[in-house]
Amino acid sequence: RAESPISSGYHFGSRIVIKDNFLYASIGERGQGMIAQDITNHPGSIIRIHLDGSIPQDNPKFTIKPKWLPEVIQIGVRNPQGMYLSPFDDEVYISNHGAKGGDFFGRVEFGGNYGWKIIGWGGTNYIGTKIGDGTAWKANFTKPLWTWTPSIAPSNILIYNGDLYPEWKGDVLVTSLKYKTLYKLNFKNNEVSSQNIIFEDLIGRIRDIEVNSKGELFLINSNSNASLWKMSKE
């Protein structure tokens, strides 16, 4: 069970990934800010458990972070709504909402700390004040691979490995709620070099993206009458 129970309608995180018979889950900080640095709580973390619910004995608590909760493998995230297992390097990647700016794409790092709310990845509080001392990133924290300021509100990610768009293989597709946009991050050799807009403001606020065995892409929006869309190559 997620601890501690928090009465809040904000920042749930929400994604689950299965890798090597382990379950990874992204947990938002529920709008509580510095709780993401509290190693005795789940909010603001990435957890890793066996599929039967038991705790892997090689998690950080048993190796490098003895004070952490046993199921937690990374802390310091705000609202990680996107998560994907790369078919290329077998690493787990996330997208995370910042506050007013500071959204990011990054890798799940064993025993790592993304730094929320000591740092804000280039964003500010909604009233315009600094997050921490205003530094976008500090040494000893996990560094995002790509950030967005202003925010795009990234809702999910997909690392493309299909045949329909061969030129996109290995790149990251990012769905945006705020700008109703599908972005593509050009991702090679563990680095993002640039981004492209595939389309914008066509289907509403984009909530999720999936790919089938043919490489065809499907998207769902989060409008009041949420609908499923198939992307055309035309």
Where are these regions (language model features)?
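Repeated scaffold domains used in trafficking and secretory/extracellular systems
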Residues: 206-208
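Short loop/turn motifs that cap or connect beta-strands within the blades
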Residues: 1-4, 61, 198-200
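Short, exposed beta-strand-loop hairpins at the edges of beta-sheets
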Residues: 217-222
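Beta-propeller domain segments
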Residues: 29-196, 204, 214, 226, ...
